[in-house]
Amino acid sequence: MRIGIISDTHGSLDPRAYAALADCDHIIHAGDIGGPSVLRELETLAPVTAVLGNNDFDEYGSAAGHFAHPVLEGVRFLVGHKPGDVRVSFAGSAALAPGDPLPDVIIHGHTHVPELKTGPDARPAGLYLCPGAVYRPRSDFGRTIAKMDVEDGHIRHTWVENLDGKVLMEA
């Protein structure tokens, strides 16, 4: 299964981002969606899991909450908008209820800067990811999305690419 990961569209889904996500079986939007029309457009490609960002309000109904915990192909995700929202420590997390299993993948948006960590830097998850931003990027990478291939409970490949399709980081 290929998962497309996008964030910070702020109401403007770049046609190149839409085209880049066309090969995905599921799409995760990590907040600052900017309007229900963005989700409707993404849903023409694949099922969408979305969370609210600090610029999103109640117009999404049940389509987006503050956190999402999808399990896709046996891989557990924790999705929130701000990096601090998805921080998990021994003291717990606002994003996880007591007794919830730890995620395999933590995803956030908000910073507009792509980030991909594995190993000890990603703890307690195996992978920590920010896809960057489709609107107003704050890095020299430009506008970015991420993709992940998962199968039978395993993350096979993860990468961040710019909207020209150039792979910028991978694990």
Task: Show which residues each predicted segment covers.
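Glycine/small-residue-rich loop that forms an oxyanion/phosphate-binding "nest" at active or ligand-binding sites
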Residues: 52-58, 62-102
